[in-house]
């Protein structure tokens, strides 16, 4: 009986691990497809895709699954993009922390229902995104390709526009960081010099970190983990340390 119990426990544990791994694989392949739709399939130009593929390799995601996800994101399959759209939701969690959830969904009613249920479970409440965004700073992380041929022009624009946050990633790529309210102006200046942004990522950081009591930490962790497990979730931002 003891041997049977041990075998049953091992089987149950393996089954739970397989389910967890399957959810991770689903989320990674979804991110690959979305990244390809937004920024193309060339990893030399799409640095977001490169990072996702590195993560896929860490989890030993099969190459055929990766390729299928990439194929879904190619230009010939843009009908996928029409079926789904990006949404963002916000709310207050335990101890009053603010949480922003970014989603890519093909059914906004289902998504908001799932998110609302999680907030209710932890006695939180959903609010309008515009009501809480003042609590965060918004930056664009921008990649510029082909620096070898345009380095002098790029550095000149950076200097004239007082862009202080920039770095050269390798001999052919540079990353610059621009505040949200300056993005359109800076983009226009670069375009006037025939320099195109090859990858653009919005980064959101809280203006102040909200220190929470240890009593609430486990609740907040559990809540955020449940939100992350939703297949539609692409990113979660909050204003505390856990």
UniProtKB/Swiss-Prot annotation:
InterPro entries: Integrase-like_N (IPR017856), TACO1_YebC-like_2nd/3rd_dom (IPR048300), TACO1_YebC_N (IPR049083), Transcrip_reg_TACO1-like (IPR002876), Transcrip_reg_TACO1-like_dom3 (IPR026564), YebC-like (IPR029072). Its main location: cytoplasm. One of its GO terms (biological process) is regulation of DNA-templated transcription. Keywords: Cytoplasm, DNA-binding, Transcription, Transcription regulation. Transmembrane segments: none annotated. GO terms for molecular function: DNA binding. GO terms for cellular component: cytoplasm. SUPFAM superfamilies: YebC-like. It holds the Pfam family Transcrip_reg. It is found in: Cytoplasm. The keyword Repeat does not apply. The keyword Transmembrane helix does not apply. PANTHER family: TRANSLATIONAL ACTIVATOR OF CYTOCHROME C OXIDASE 1. Belongs to the TACO1 family. This is Probable transcriptional regulatory protein BCc_197. It comes from Buchnera aphidicola subsp. Cinara cedri (strain Cc). The lineage of its organism: Bacteria, Pseudomonadati, Pseudomonadota, Gammaproteobacteria, Enterobacterales.
